[in-house]
Amino acid sequence: MADGPRCKRRKQANPRRNNVTNYNNVIEANSDSDDEDKLHIVEEESITDAADCDASVPEDDLPTDHTVLPENSEREGSTNSCWEDEGKETKEILGPEAQSDEVGCTVKEDECDSDAENEQNHDPNVEEFLQQEDTAVIYPEAPEEDQRQGTPEASGQDENGTPDAFSQLLTCPYCDRGYKRFTSLKEHIKYRHEKNEDNFSCSLCSYTFAYRTQLDRHMTSHKSGRDQRHVTQSSGNRKFKCTECGKAFKYKHHLKEHLRIHSGEKPYECPNCKKRFSHSGSYSSHISSKKCIGLMPVKGRARSGLKTSQCSSPSLSASPGSPARPQIRQKIENKPLQEQLPVNQIKTEPVDYEFKPIVVASGINCSTPLQNGVFSGGSPLQATSSPQGVVQAVVLPTVGLVSPISINLSDIQNVLKVAVDGNVIRQVLENNHANLASKEQETISNASIQQAGHSLISAISLPLVDQDGTTKIIINYSLEQPSQLQVVPQNLKKEHSVPTNSCKNEKLPEDLTVKSEKDKNFEGETNDSTCLLCDDCPGDLNALQELKHYETKNPPQLPQSSGTEAEKPSSPAPSETGENNLSPGQPPLKNLLSLLKAYYALNAQPSAEELSKIADSVNLPLDVVKKWFEKMQAGQISVQSSGPSSPEQVKISSPTDNDDQAATTNESEPQNSTNNSQNPANTSKSQTSSGGSTQNGSRSSTPSPSPLNLSSSRNSQGYTYTAEGVQEEPQMEPLDLSLPKQHGELLERSTITSVYQNSVYSVQEEPLNLTCAKKEPQKDNSITDSDPIVNVIPPSANPINIAIPTVTAQLPTIVAIADQNSVPCLRALAANKQTILIPQVAYTYSTTVSPAVQETPPKQTQANGSQDERQDTSSEGVSNVEDQNDSDSTPPKKKMRKTENGMYACDLCDKIFQKSSSLLRHKYEHTGKRPHECGICKKAFKHKHHLIEHMRLHSGEKPYQCDKCGKRFSHSGSYSQHMNHRYSYCKREAEERDSTEQEEVGQEVLSSEHAGARASPSQIDSDERESLTREEEEDSEKEEEEEEEKDVEGLQEEKECRKLQDVEEEEEVEEEEEEEEGKTEGNKNDDVVNRASNAEPEVIQSNGQVSEEKTNKA
């Protein structure tokens, strides 16, 4: 390497520059690199150094057997090459783009024809060079004088140009790199420009590389400086790139959180200080830190209220003067579980932010607190009549939900009455002033509640998680007066005194109010209960029912005047119209039915286009109209008003008829025993109420009189009612919705019939029970299969389960679940439960219990909140069925509702998942459910891998080991913390420990008194630092405790060793002094004994031995 300044050349007196005749034949040379490493980056770095080496080669050393241009051009090229080298350096700094231009092109102006000409001349010359076996030297063209002024060395250059080795360089025809040796040029072409299958080629500059890593490194030279900042050695693994800033991430969820920085979205909010976070990690750190201390549990975690019955719950007292005013729910995805909010905060809909009216109970005694997760008190809650419309609300603490949910007990009662009663749909909007415009759902009851009977709420459970992930609250609800609860079930045949209940006008979501039109005149009339949304229903399936289903999808389309759930599309409506049960709000229903029948009369078999037009004209969904036409064509719906207009028209069939018809129905389609029992149509004998309400005998003929079929799923295999089978139940009396009662042999031989209480709520003879009926499909079609089930139910076994889904934004009106494939509704707690879903309220009617369930009715009743702790932890109060089999015998796709894109959306927050299992695990965040429990210490975890790591604490397994210090870890988190934060200095600590141990061993041989003192400080410090890092790990608490105990034991042992060593040392020194002083042996022994009294017994023994030795010496 030349140490002196570059371009210091031998000067000649008479430089001649005008003899270069053909510049086109001259090939510019850049530089040479003797040590080519096959990498473009390294080649660039070596250009300058190689040029300096070549500059020192004297002219005399040049070979003589090669073709040489005239001497003048040789001298001219010497200085020119210097400037070319300088220009090359600047181009290297600028980047590869600048290198693409030939250096000579920057020098020549007028004397050089063009870049194209030079390139054209390169190829034949290079071919000629490649054919030669020796080195050819070519001298570049002479530069213009004024071009030199740009470089620093130019000022010091003499006019005399000097020939140098730069003129000897060979240029690559592909990339214009110069090489002094021909073999170097050949190698360069072979490794850089010769393409084959094994090489990796750059698409930008045609460079080839033997390894992909070389190509990746080379590609970074083409990136801009902004992009290169984010390029790392592991850039190949970062597949997810931000389109805004170009930053790349290894994982997609990291990119999602990063994008929130650009969008400004901050979905995580602290419930205490209201601070918002864009990253879940920041939110988690904030929650777990001690900075924001409020109502939140420690580290943001809380156990499920069902698991720990002693969880704190707010008192359910509400001020009678003011209604519960809901607050808008902020969108939080990972709030801490069981957040205790003020009583006036009510959970609103999370997804679409539509605000449903809050149910408000008038005059309800809400003073009793929740006990063991169940709202119960010494006396049941009573919804008494309150003409003043006093508004009180029961606020239930939700488990893992955003905020407590408010329940209006009186509205629940009214809606329940209306729902059970077929006349639900005849409701009129009267609370126009109570609107949703203010986003505060404040339902004001203007009309006084006329209630002769009392509604009793014996228990309100904490939220439960259904099999499909829906969170519900179960209310043990009884509509009878307390005196009537004593009635014996066998008194079924006696007419029930029907209390006159005019439901108060309640504002349902979408401004749909349900007003029970049950005037005292209509108390005795048949309930127009029909199968809601049930395709399997007989022809008298109420159009109302399907209309309800439609309303859930398109609530705004329903005219308010038609009633929230006017019975629209099906034939059942005519029966109701004939029975004068229709309220003024029902004429639209008549119009709809008359329109449908008119269309049917015109064309009994309309085409698809005509059906769509008909559906648009009647404002009903196409599938509903299509089904109605199909049933009309099948004869299941009579063209005339299918229901008898008067009680006299009711057809009465004998019990044998019922049996035969039930048998045919069973043969036609297998049924769940639960469905059979719950099918209102199967009601054996119900008495006509005092009002003389009639029951429709043939369900097919009279759609409205048939009781509501509340079967929750098509899987439960409810009846597909044919015209013949539908008529199984000629019922002379209104449906008795109380518990199914044994009617002698009739019930024993017939399919289990669920006797629902009269729609007017006649006195129930038994208290309602919250036992959950377990799904048990009926394997035999014979009626006798249901016989054992009939007798299974204890007097109080027939509960009305009121399941209140905490979030049912998609359910604007009362909805009965019929088919889980088509109906986007919540399911009952057990798949066979018959359920009505009302905005924020789902009523589950369980009329019979399968034999498997009868053994554990108390537990199921307690499942509402006070159930046995073990069962709650496993099933979270959903049902025993889910505990036995997560798949729940239904296809997985039916368990979770899919969105349009096939994704699984959480109904408690806005998150969407690709797999149902991911959604199920996500639900644990809301519910606090921890399904994976340690069998040793009973600690539960949300994720299985957390349990696996926890089990290592018990087994002592430590699979993770630091390769530096050799320390082992049982948790991957502890190992990760160590590797991220302590790996840089953990080896030094290990060496220090080793050195101290060696010192300790050596000093034990010589003097062991100082070794322990030196070893302990480093050990203590390392252990303290280690414990600090491990505190961040949630599942390593036990490990920390064990290590701390070991540390304490070690310190105690060290202290004891020090004491022993100090005692021994003092004894030796004093004994020597005593020997010198000639003290007596007795004095020595006394001193030794006195000092040994403060030490261990071993020390005393050793002291005694020492004293004996000294005595011998003396």
From Swiss-Prot:
Bias (Basic and acidic residues) ranges: 504-523, 1048-1062, 1079-1089
Chain residues forming the annotated DNA-binding region: 581-640
GO cellular component: nucleus
Example GO molecular function: zinc ion binding
Zinc finger (C2H2-type) residue numbers: 170-193, 200-222, 240-262, 268-292, 904-926, 932-954, 960-981
Polar residues: compositionally biased ranges: 149-160, 573-584, 636-681, 852-866, 874-890
First-listed, main subcellular location of the protein, grouped into a coarse class: nucleus
Region: Disordered, residue numbers: 1-105, 142-163, 304-326, 491-529, 553-588, 636-716, 852-898, 989-1114
Biased composition (Low complexity): 15-30, 309-326, 682-716
Classification via SUPFAM superfamilies: beta-beta-alpha zinc fingers, Homeodomain-like
Tissue specificity field: Expression is developmentally regulated with high expression in mesoderm, nervous system and lens.
Domain of life per record: Eukaryota
Compartment(s) of residence: Nucleus
GO biological process assignments: central nervous system development; negative regulation of DNA-templated transcription; negative regulation of transcription by RNA polymerase II; positive regulation of neuron differentiation; regulation of transcription by RNA polymerase II
Keywords assigned by UniProt, alphabetized: DNA-binding, Homeobox, Metal-binding, Nucleus, Repeat, Transcription, Transcription regulation, Zinc, Zinc-finger
One family name in Pfam for this protein: zf-Di19
Residue ranges with Acidic residues bias: 1031-1047, 1063-1078
Gene3D superfamilies membership: Classic Zinc Finger (3.30.160.60), Homeodomain-like (1.10.10.60)
Annotated motif CTBP-binding motif, positions: 767-771
SMART domains: HOX, ZnF_C2H2
Family according to the record: Belongs to the delta-EF1/ZFH-1 C2H2-type zinc-finger family.
PANTHER family in UniProt: HISTONE H4 TRANSCRIPTION FACTOR-RELATED, ZINC FINGER E-BOX-BINDING HOMEOBOX 1
Entry function: Acts as a transcriptional repressor. Positively regulates neuronal differentiation. Represses transcription by binding to the E box-containing promoter. Binds to delta 1-crystallin enhancer core and represses lens-specific transcription. It also binds many other non-lens specific DNA sequences.
Protein name: Zinc finger E-box-binding homeobox 1
Organism: Gallus gallus
